[in-house]
Amino acid sequence: MSQQTTIRKLAELVNTPVDKLLVQLAEAGMKFSGPDQVVTSTEKMKLLGFLRRTHGKAETPAEAASEAAKKITLNRRKLQEVTVSAGRTKTTVNVEVRQKRTYVKSENEGSGRATPMTPDEERADILAKLAASRQRNLDEQQRLAESDRVRDEEIQRKRDEEQAAKDRAEAERKAAEEAAAAASAPAPVAAAPTPSAAAPAARAPSSPSSAPRPSRPGGASPASRPSTPARPDDRNNAAKHKTRGSHVMVAGVEDDDATKRFAGQLHLSAADRARRSNVRGKPTGRPGSSSSRRGNDNGRGSNQANSGPHGFERPTAPVVREVAIGETITVADLAQKLALKGGDVVKALFKMGVMATITQSIDHDTAALVTEELGHKAVRADNADFEDALLAHAEDAQGDTTTRPPVVTIMGHVDHGKTSLLDYIRRTKIASGEAGGITQHIGAYHVETDRGVISFLDTPGHAAFTSMRARGAKITDIVVLVVAADDGVMPQTKEAVAHAKAAGVPLIVAVNKIDKAGADPLRVKNELLAENVVAEDFGGDTQFIEVSAKVGTGVDTLLDAISLQAEVLELKAVAEGRASGTVIESSLDKGRGPVATVLVQQGALKRGDYLVCGIQYGRVRALFDETGHQPGSAGPSIPVQVLGLSGVPEAGDDFVVVDDERLAKDVAQQRETKRRESRLVASATNRMEDILAQMGKGEGQQVLNLVIKADVQGSVEALKQSLVALSNEDIRINVIHSGVGGITESDANSAAASKATIIGFNVRADASARKIVESNGVDLRYFSIIYDVIDQVKQVASGLLGVEIREEIMGIAQVRDVFRSSKFGAVAGCMIIEGVVKRSKPIRVLRDSVVVFEGELESLRRFKENVDEVRNGNECGIGVKAYNDVKAGDQIECFERIEVARTL
């Protein structure tokens, strides 16, 4: 180092704080006033030597060698065998003992003494050493005595505090018992002393501050024992065996009782005896108890039952619990929360008319009723922890709002030209691609016009797609109601008006097909007036635009009306951040997996985002628009197809983009659990209703089982609703399974097991499914138009109903007189007053409009000739088989039974 090294620089070089370095220099005998002073090389070496001496190291290699020469270490190893008894046998164990000794040569050894000490000097040296040793022993004894005194005082203080706490708890317990006894007693006894006055007197002797403790028979108390200084050897033994229980020795357990207690245990040390005495003979602190009277005789007094604050007390009143119940709960969980047996809860449910097992789930209302019936209070549990986290996650994504394109839904009756109108706007040929020329899916498109971007939703007009139209009206901004000028208002037109009003969405009426010869726009306005849709011409606020989807008349005016209505609504949304929206349609593509058509309502949906969609979740693998292109992102009011979900979501579910997959998975699993529990509760209720219905109706009702598979979720929903609605009191349509995608082997097995008919709507069965269908004779039918599905199911259901026997009255004959015949008995002379009477047909005899006989017409004669029939206005003789009580004035009704095929 340089000669001009300062203390600060030296501290940086040796990585030591400046203050510490100044202290070390001062200890080495070098005084410096500040860190900026210069340190010479000599001073550095002096500091280094001081530090080496301080840490016990030699300053130079020569000194280190000399230090090593003064030490010698000897290692000794000795082997021996030890015999150990293990049960009845003895085992020899080899034991190796290793010893290590280090000998250090003193400095003066070997060098000799220059002047040997005289005997007087040696004696003085020995006396000085003895005096120093004696003084050290006295100091150590005083220190130990002081520490023992402090420890004893601390132990006594803790005991006093524990005793006071026990006394307070005992007093409170007695006061509670006396209050309960006074409340249950019929009348207080005046001569009896009050417990509150007797309690302090009973507790007075036990208080350490009020009275001295009785001395033990074996010796004096710790307070009266003289404090004699302990011998050094005793102190050493006490220091060697110091344990947790040593304070009991100080408190005076070395008495006769202790000697008797540990008789035969002389191998125990004093500390071990004290610890065992502390554990076995701890006093209960209750004067007058059996343990206090007997003392600590053999430690048995501590086995008495402790009636302190930790003892069991029987409740004096029923315990009312507050039970948190979610949407669903199993009977076993409810019983656990009520602290009851599961059988008791099941019995209570049976008394309420609910048949449930201990593992079955019940809904919140049923659980709340049975909880209140059992005397407890039910509260609704908050199970929306993940939902709350998702809501907070979505609220954090709020940002600046910008103007967004309008979402326009095209609604109307079937075949009124909705898709054709949208086709003209988009300049494509969509209508020709739909089976039967009708729309069976929700088509979502966005169109760039001269007036900006407009997103269109084309909904089906068929009656089976009610839920699709309701879903379209829910997420839309403007509804364009298409009405054919030649047909006028139809049932689905009225339904579309109701959906628009329920959603609070403004309505624009497009009167289509005005180019046809029978078009009457005024008729449309008048018919819609009955539905409270008032045109602007009539003083209302609804725009009526006359258009022609075939030639394009009025389409530009319709777009202007849509843009004007959007400006009035001032539609805004957050264009950046995490996206959220609604699922319009979903399907299962064999090559791409689950595909969901979503409408973004907030934020921007990008590739790679994690999203929760109903009970499904996943990462967006790809985005597709209606033209098949892959946009980079989709903003508000833009419909896109999403790939990458874990399953097919339900149409109408909301989706939210989250930051991580963990939150998405947790939310989806919680929703799936809730939906499954609700479905189990509903299915159990339905099964019970089915059992009761079968008990009431017998075996008369037929059941038609169906398995429905379709290409998109909306079609599955529409088919289920339409087919189940065909059920009546004679036949029940039961959809045992429905789903999206092709017909698989499991679908075929389910249909074979339940003897169901498989309906494939725009889907086909794979090879394994076809093999099962052929081998088991399962009825498999393919459809592409929903009309055909409904008609075919009606025919199949009608075939299950069989035929109906109907009675048709053919003619009525009035009895004018009765004749006797040896061959036929009584023969009625009749006049045919209605219809035709034929031979060998069943008849009824009516007397005063009451049926008195039902049988068969045996003989029919006219002018003594047998005839097959007699018509109205003619006279005849009628012989009734096995009936002779015919009287004048009776009516004979002739009828026939015919079979009529039953239909739905």
UniProtKB/Swiss-Prot annotation:
Keyword GTP-binding in annotation: yes
Comp. bias (Basic and acidic residues): 136-177
Region (Disordered) location: 134-248, 267-315
Annotated GO CC locations: cytosol
Any GO molecular function: translation initiation factor activity
Subcellular location: Cytoplasm
Region (G4): 512-515
Region (G5), start-end ranges: 548-550
Biased composition range(s): Low complexity: 178-230, 285-303
Keywords: Cytoplasm, GTP-binding, Initiation factor, Nucleotide-binding, Protein biosynthesis
CDD domains: IF2_eIF5B, IF2_mtIF2_II, mtIF2_IVc
UniProt xrefs under Pfam families: EF-G_D2 (PF22042), GTP_EFTU (PF00009), GTP_EFTU_D2 (PF03144), IF-2 (PF11987), IF2_assoc (PF08364), IF2_N (PF04760)
Residues in tr-type G domain copies: 403-572
Record carries keyword Cell cycle: no
Annotated segments matching region G3: 458-461
Ligand binding (GTP): 412-419, 458-462, 512-515
Residue ranges, annotated region (G1): 412-419
Chain positions covered by the region annotation G2: 437-441
Primary role: One of the essential components for the initiation of protein synthesis. Protects formylmethionyl-tRNA from spontaneous hydrolysis and promotes its binding to the 30S ribosomal subunits. Also involved in the hydrolysis of GTP during the formation of the 70S ribosomal complex.
NCBIfam families: IF-2, small_GTP
Annotated family: Belongs to the TRAFAC class translation factor GTPase superfamily. Classic translation factor GTPase family. IF-2 subfamily.
Protein name as catalogued: Translation initiation factor IF-2
Gene transcribed to yield this protein: infB
